[in-house]
């Protein structure tokens, strides 16, 4: 008789969760407002090409992000990452401050 070895998957749910967590969306933008407690408003700018005329236009989106330590100030360039819903409007959190406002 021949014995067969079963291949067991060494991947755990925790490892899958860690991979998913590292695969979240990230954006770089400028802090527009830091007046709220533990919350910043970040403006993310992007360029898009007009579908008919081909001109490049600048568009912006604003995101409310969680800033646990109230570290960011207006004008700072920051990196934000998508996260679970923290409140009605907050689905992003501050990862790092890239450049301080001058």
UniProtKB/Swiss-Prot annotation:
Listed Gene3D superfamilies: Nucleic acid-binding proteins
Annotated GO CC locations: cytosolic small ribosomal subunit
Pfam families named among the record's database cross-references: Ribosomal_S17
Annotated keywords: Ribonucleoprotein, Ribosomal protein, RNA-binding, rRNA-binding
Gene Ontology molecular functions: rRNA binding; structural constituent of ribosome
Chain residue ranges for the region called Disordered: 1-27
Keyword Cell division: no
GO biological process annotation, one example: translation
PANTHER family cross-referenced by the UniProt entry: 40S RIBOSOMAL PROTEIN S11 FAMILY MEMBER, SMALL RIBOSOMAL SUBUNIT PROTEIN US17M
Matching NCBIfam families: PRK05610.1 (NF004123), uS17_bact (TIGR03635)
Biological function: One of the primary rRNA binding proteins, it binds specifically to the 5'-end of 16S ribosomal RNA.
Subunit and partners: Part of the 30S ribosomal subunit.
Family from the record: Belongs to the universal ribosomal protein uS17 family.
Protein name: Small ribosomal subunit protein uS17
Organism: Salinibacter ruber (strain DSM 13855 / M31)
Encoding gene, per UniProt annotation: rpsQ
